[in-house]
Amino acid sequence: MTTFDTDVVVIGAGPVGLTLANLIGVRGHRATVLEARHELIDYPRGVGLDDESIRTLHTAGLWERVEPYTVPHHVVRLVNGTGRVLATNNPRTQEFGYPRKHGFVQPLVDKELAAGLDRFPGTELRFGHKVTGLEDRGDHVAVTAELRSPEGELVDSVTLTARYAVGCEGGSSFTRKWMGVDFEGKSPSTRWVVVDVANDPIGTPSVYLGADPRRPYVSIGLPQGIRRWEFMLHDDEPTELCDDPAFMRSLLRRHVPDPAALQVINQRTFTHHGRVAADFRKGRVFLAGDAAHLMPVWLGQGWNSGIRDATNLAWKLSAVLADDASDALLDTYSTERRKHASDMIDVNMAAGAVMKMGRFGGAMRDVAASALNLVPKWKSYFTELRFKPMPRYAAGVVVDQATLTPGRARAGFKRGGGLAPFVDSAGELSPVGLQFIQPRVNTSEAAGVLLDDVTGDWWTLATWGTDPTAYLNAADLAFVRRHRVKLVSFMPETQRAWAERQFADSPAPITVVGDGTGALKDWFDVRACGLVVLRPDHFVAAACLTRQAPRALAALRRAASLTTESADEPTREGVAA
């Protein structure tokens, strides 16, 4: 077998590239991160961290390191030019185990992501390496980089070989240009100036989106006493004006007394972008993060969208590297992630349009907001963050719940016959393609732990209230062993001890999980399934009645291009695009 320098070359040491390398390392594979700079970027860019990203950081074993640099339950208020609150975004549920929104200090978080690579002997971060060449050689890639001194002098040129390469080097991505894919979308002409200050002169912990017709602004309370302001520049204001201290003081004077006394940490200008690459894959080369899509900042989803990319791609690369799946599995990365990234861009662009309305449009907006706030259903739509598009994978590594066929999964699900005599199902929607919940649970070894700590970071087959092996034939059990599928039985806490005794002699090990909070019972109670198969990224790959388990697993094998027990080479069964 040919030996390569590493398994995956990651181009760019931003949060996406570092997270991807950590996720590859935690699953036992090698990754080399090449970064053109000689150090991590030391100024904050992203300021919002959501529960999905935290779940990923927990999977990577990094959340405990990162948590001290965050503020949970970051409340966001949209206010008009007079300061009246038009809408409040303050979700308090924790479906995925963590508060829905956090503020964070990105440079400190990025340092922890970089330090996390030291845990793995097969991962490394190389600064001062600017990638200048890519070559797809069929069974591997060759990545060429110039090693330059901090003064810019060329020291050496190196070429690394790897099974795959992933470009995570931002919006001006060399990798994307090498791939030759279109970067579709638009870049609005509006420019913004960002100011970060120490010793927060306001001291409030939340976020204000100022939809002020005179000059839209953003004011954000961040950890460690940092305050961020963002101000829109008018078309007749040159960018160079931001270098004038008097101009900057005039922007800040409406928000804080004595702006000249502020301790400015960082100041810069930027332009919002809304773009997405036409494809996230070309052969053995992939795009992730800003290299794949540029996200307007309004909902704080740029950082989080990139982490979703890393979460999705990392387990698929790991499966192929371990010969658990064929290369065809990697085609589902672009299939699954591109649509959601595009949807998130659209929502962010709409939010920006609401912020930038003129006097007449702003007045109409304020009237509409007042009317919507009178209707609890519509008010909660904003308060509970229900307008945020949640990832739902309709094509890819999914099995349709109604037909148990691979590659596509319809959101709607109609119960039929007498097979699922449930009533008031959750909106008649299938859970397939959605992220599974993460309550705190009990086991024989620990109490009150997060579900992911029990199920782990690979495949899980779970049933409610029964022994999952009762529904599996010999071929299914062989599949479970081959792909290290964890078998789990969710039980009411009152039945956990009984189940542990009862299932002790089952043909495969079963982890019994006590549902101490009732969250798992509530989840199954309104869904027409008694069995779920969870992917390594905690999304539901299949859901069915317990007796349908063999059909669901057979379809999953095809949807994920998984290898079989007897195959010498990985199978290459196609997945619907």
Describe each region flagged by the PLM.
Residues F4-T6, E153-Y164:
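Core beta-strand elements of the Rossmann-like FAD/NAD(P) dinucleotide-binding domain
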Residues G17-L18:
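N-terminal Rossmann-fold NAD(P) dinucleotide-binding loop
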Residues F127-V141:
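A conserved short coil-to-beta-strand element within the FAD-binding core of flavoproteins
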Residues C242-S305, A325, V347, M390-P391, ...:
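FAD/FMN-dependent oxidoreductases across multiple families
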